[in-house]
């Protein structure tokens, strides 16, 4: 099974990029198994390295469904990162962030 995570942006960087002081991101990973958690942790590490002032939250799909974080925070789906296309997907996500002015 190929694991993936979905990346969302929320907060001022996505509501009003000119007033933003940080970039709030949410990583939603598929489950609580080791491989899913490791992929989410690696994504968080790489995103934190490449995005200045990033604040990154991680939730499993079940946790996100329980808390309704995406809806409550009015989070914007930015893309997905698949473990077998990690670098390509990370580059695509970076492009999306640049286009939105969140970088």
Regions of interest found by a model, annotated:
Residues 1-10, 14-20, 29-103:
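Catalytic core of pol beta-like nucleotidyltransferases
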């Amino acid at each position: 099974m190929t694991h993936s995570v979905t990346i969302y942006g929320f907060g001022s960087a996505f509501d009003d990029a000119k007033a933003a002081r940080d970039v709030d991101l949410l990583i939603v990973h598929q489950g609580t198994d080791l491989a899913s958690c490791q992929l989410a942790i690696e994504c968080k590490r790489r995103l934190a390295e490449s995005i200045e002032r990033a604040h990154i939250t991680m939730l499993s799909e079940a946790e996100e469904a329980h808390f309704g974080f995406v809806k409550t925070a009015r989070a914007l789906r930015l893309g997905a990162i698949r473990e077998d296309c990690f670098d390509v997907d990370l580059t695509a996500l970076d492009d999306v962030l640049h286009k939105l002015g969140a970088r």
